[in-house]
């Protein structure tokens, strides 16, 4: 008897429908074909044990299973459930009349329980695209899959539940989620607020400019000055995710297995803060399954690299291409996947090895040579890709105790959203361009061309600071954002002056002043 079940292979953010053909004839052999990896081949043992523990006997027959298309690599344990259902149907234990209506995925435990899988959301999107009536997933994955409309998604706890579902023994109801309602209810729930930050007005301003234009930013200051504290509050002033952005971000986290069992969509912009010991694969993505790395998990959000100079230099250099292209390609022997990584890079670092270079409250013990070597850990090309360099000093306790609470994030966010709306209107004719940080050179000439006085000021700064052509473009992009925050149609000298002030690390006197 020949039976077919349907599941999916996840490759990057896409899913490919896989047809499982189970043929059962007289004999005692078990054959599995179709480019299956070790985990798929081991499913035979898991299924045998699961069937025994729920009261079914594994068929004594010659079982041949083909997983098509044969040229697509089948990886992981998500094929356990469709394989088990196919074997039971071929053995006459399950009515096969509805099998063609449903896509089935899930890992089967030795006791017959269903365990969560990665990539349930891309699989659900593919199931709807291929006109399947419904999708059967483990209970832990049901909410993330149920965000796909016009698809009946059933969350099951065990293999017994799936058997009863197809045999009609019990009446199961699909999980239904009001995606839009949940999305808009959770958009503005933040754990941190800028109202908690006293002082540091210049740093808050730099973060506001960065948020308004989507600019990369680095904060340089001594220990305890509040660099990490303010970075954690940056998502609270960013524009809210659109529903399309939320869906794309959730897909990435679904593929990486980062969604909890009660999560449906990611409602807020991601904030990823990997430790400085992270590997190149952990940051960029990869491994044998081409999983997304931190740069992709931060897509549509913030990647925060605390203590930037402590990261391995080779690891940091990986960021150069993703920051420029806003996507990253991972190539393996049999396939290539591409993940989006349109993110804001926010970094922090001490100004020198001891941490107190330029600090009025402490004495720096570093020599100019030590400071120069310390700063050289960050390459020029990477630094050129960071639009805003912001110095930060610790606020003395005597002043801190007298200060009033800071401006709430909500008020800052309103200004940021207003500036972003101006940019969205400006870039409507340009596909894929949403904010000033994404502008091309041609757009700079059209939208950020400085007047004569501003151009003279910029030329003088370029000569004195020995800035690169890329740094010149960054200054114009930041100036355009400052103008948007001010509601100005033109980039004026005051905007250029502030933007030049955000190129602190380009100054040649860093290793010579203050010690």
Residue ranges of model-derived segments:
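Basic, amphipathic alpha-helical bundle interface domains used for macromolecular binding and assembly
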Residues: 33-44, 59, 66-76, 290, ...
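Walker B catalytic acidic pair
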Residues: 300, 306-307, 318
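The Walker A (P-loop) glycine that initiates the GxxxxGKT/S ATP-binding motif of P-loop NTPases
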Residues: 221, 285, 307
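Conserved inter-motif catalytic segment of the P-loop NTP-binding fold
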Residues: 245-279, 286-287, 393, 434-442, ...
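Peripheral, non-AAA+ core regions of ATP-driven protein-machinery
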Residues: 1-218, 222-228, 331, 471-472, ...
């Amino acid at each position: 008897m020949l039976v077919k079940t349907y599941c999916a292979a996840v490759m990057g953010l896409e899913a490919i429908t896989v047809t499982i053909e189970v043929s059962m004839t007289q004999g005692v052999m078990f054959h599995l074909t179709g480019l299956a990896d070790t985990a798929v081949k081991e499913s035979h043992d898991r299924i045998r044990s699961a069937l025994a523990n729920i009261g079914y006997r594994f068929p004594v027959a010659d079982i041949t299973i083909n997983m098509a298309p044969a040229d697509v690599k089948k990886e992981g344990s998500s094929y356990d459930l469709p394989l088990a259902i196919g074997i039971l149907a071929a053995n006459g234990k399950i009515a096969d009349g509805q099998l063609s209506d449903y896509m089935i995925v899930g890992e089967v435990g030795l006791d017959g329980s269903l365990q969560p899988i990665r990539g349930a959301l891309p699989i659900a999107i593919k199931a709807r695209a291929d006109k399947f009536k419904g999708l059967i997933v483990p209970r832990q994955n049901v909410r993330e899959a149920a965000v796909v409309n016009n698809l009946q998604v059933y969350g099951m706890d065990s293999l017994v539940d799936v058997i009863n579902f197809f045999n009609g023994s019990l009446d199961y109801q699909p999980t239904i989620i009001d995606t839009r309602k949940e999305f808009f209810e959770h958009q503005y729930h933040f754990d941190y607020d800028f109202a908690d930050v006293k002082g540091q007005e210049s740093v808050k301003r730099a973060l506001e400019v960065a948020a308004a234009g989507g600019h990369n930013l680095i904060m340089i200051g001594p220990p305890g000055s509040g660099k990490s504290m303010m970075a954690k509050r940056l998502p609270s002033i960013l524009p809210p995710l659109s529903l399309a952005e939320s869906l794309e971000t959730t897909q990435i986290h679904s593929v990486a297995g980062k969604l909890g069992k009660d999560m449906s969509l990611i409602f807020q912009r991601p904030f990823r803060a990997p430790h400085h010991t992270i590997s190149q694969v952990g940051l960029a993505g990869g491994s044998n399954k081409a999983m997304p790395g931190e740069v992709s998990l931060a897509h549509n959000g913030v990647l925060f690299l605390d203590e930037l100079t402590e990261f391995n230099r080779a690891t940091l250099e990986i960021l150069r291409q993703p920051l420029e292209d806003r996507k990253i390609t991972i190539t393996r022997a049999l396939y290539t996947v591409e993940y989006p990584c349109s993110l804001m890079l926010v970094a922090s670092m001490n100004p020198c090895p001891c941490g107190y270079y330029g600090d009025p409250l402490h004495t720096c013990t570093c020599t100019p040579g030590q400071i120069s070597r310390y700063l050289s850990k960050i390459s020029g090309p990477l630094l050129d890709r960071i639009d805003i360099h912001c110095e930060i000093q610790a606020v003395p306790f005597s002043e801190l105790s007298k200060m009033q609470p800071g401006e709430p994030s909500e008020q800052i966010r309103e200004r940021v959203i207003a500036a972003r709306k101006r940019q969205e209107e400006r870039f409507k004719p340009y596909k894929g361009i949403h904010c000033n940080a994404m502008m091309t050179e041609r757009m700079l000439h059209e939208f950020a061309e400085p007047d004569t006085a501003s151009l003279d000021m910029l030329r003088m700064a370029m000569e004195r600071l020995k800035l690169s052509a890329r740094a010149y473009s960054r200054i114009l992009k930041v100036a355009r954002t400052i103008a948007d925050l001010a509601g100005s149609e033109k980039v004026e000298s005051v905007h250029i002056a502030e933007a030049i002030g955000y190129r602190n690390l380009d100054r040649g006197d860093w290793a010579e002043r203050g010690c």
